[in-house]
A protein has these predicted regions:
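Interaction interfaces in information-processing and related assembly proteins
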Residues: 2-206
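Cys/His-clustered metal-coordination modules, chiefly Zn-binding fingers
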Residues: 177-272
Length: 272
């Protein structure tokens, strides 16, 4: 595959990337590709802004989570939003990633402390599409790599083969089986064959989509998030302090909430 073309969209306040999807003629496979350098840089700055320290062992799984869920989302319907929670047993680690086609947003978070031991990896996939009821799939796995765990999820839940390949440090390629796919060809793909894929296979461009690392959490949303807890156990929550620090469960951003603000929020009539 040759390098992706320069981004053609107008610049925004958040760095965005372009993901392209192709159809491999004669092989009946969908190919999605993106250069994630801008999103990885935005994720790094997000961590610096909020004092989020990431263990060295977390760097690769988190990057793989951000990139793979973005490519997965780019291959899905426009009205669909998806979220993955992936639990690794050893080392004990939870990785969360979400992507929304409607907003073009991608986020990720992780947890390494206060986790119960588990015997095998667990992959939870949640999907929301327009007004349809949310759907959840749960798959167990034994792989150590996040990308291999996604491949197991596709095999067991989606009932089709998918492969992931890094084309560079920040350039990921996904090849997913479609109906009547040449699965022997797909299973036999290697790092070297990915480099010449556009010369060996006829590729037809399907779509271009834009994605940005952005959560959307803010003070108002965190007040709504914490209000039910405050109503049940306000004193236990604050321990006499005028404010508390709350982490967004989706992106790990730190928000300072005052008792006064929560009291004002919970005292509002329900119709307001």
């Amino acid at each position: 595959l040759t390098p992706p073309a320069e981004r053609v969209s107008e610049p925004t306040s958040d760095p965005d990337i372009e993901v392209r999807t192709y159809f491999a003629r004669g092989r009946n496979a969908l190919i999605a590709r993106g250069d994630f350098s801008e999103i990885f840089a935005a994720w790094y700055l997000h961590r610096m802004d909020h004092g989020i320290e990431i263990p060295a062992a977390m760097e690769d799984p988190a990057r793989e989570a951000i990139a793979s869920i973005t490519l997965h989302s780019a291959s899905r319907p426009w009205k669909e939003a998806c979220a993955w929670t992936v639990k690794f047993p050893e080392p004990r680690l939870n990785v969360f990633a979400a992507a929304d086609n409607h907003t073009g947003s991608v986020i990720a978070n992780f947890q390494t402390s206060d986790l119960q031991p588990i015997g095998e990896g667990m992959f939870y996939a949640d999907v929301v599409e327009d007004a349809k009821p949310p759907r959840r799939s749960v798959v167990d796995f034994r792989e150590k790599s996040f990308l291999r765990a996604v491949e197991v999820f596709y095999s067991q839940s989606e009932q089709r083969l998918v492969r992931f390949f890094w084309h560079g440090e920040e350039d990921l390629v996904m090849v997913a089986a479609q109906p009547d796919c040449d699965e022997e060809w797909l299973a036999g793909l290697t790092q070297d064959s990915i480099r010449t894929l556009d010369r060996d296979v006829e590729l037809s461009l399907l779509e271009k989509r834009q994605f940005t690392f952005r959560c959307g959490c803010n003070q108002e949303r965190m007040l709504d998030f914490m209000s039910p807890v405050f109503q049940r156990q306000a004193d236990e929550l604050f321990h006499g302090d005028p404010s508390i620090s709350v982490l967004c469960p989706r992106c790990g951003a730190r928000h300072i909430l005052t008792r006064e603000a929560l009291e004002a929020r919970t005292s509002k009539p329900s119709h307001e």
